[in-house]
């Protein structure tokens, strides 16, 4: 993952992790080679090309 992908991923996580994703966000993640799902209000899971998942817990 290059520095642009890391920065973009960080910004998307900080700005959108606890709100609904929109189609343009999904498109950006797909173009960066990232896969996303949103579990029922608990975790956002981002999976890079390596297949490693990053779980981001809900803020308390």
Swiss-Prot record:
May be a truncated MGF 360 family protein. This is Protein MGF 360-5L. Plays a role in virus cell tropism, and may be required for efficient virus replication in macrophages. Induction: Expressed in the early phase of the viral replicative cycle. It comes from African swine fever virus (strain Badajoz 1971 Vero-adapted). Belongs to the asfivirus MGF 360 family. Keywords: Early protein.
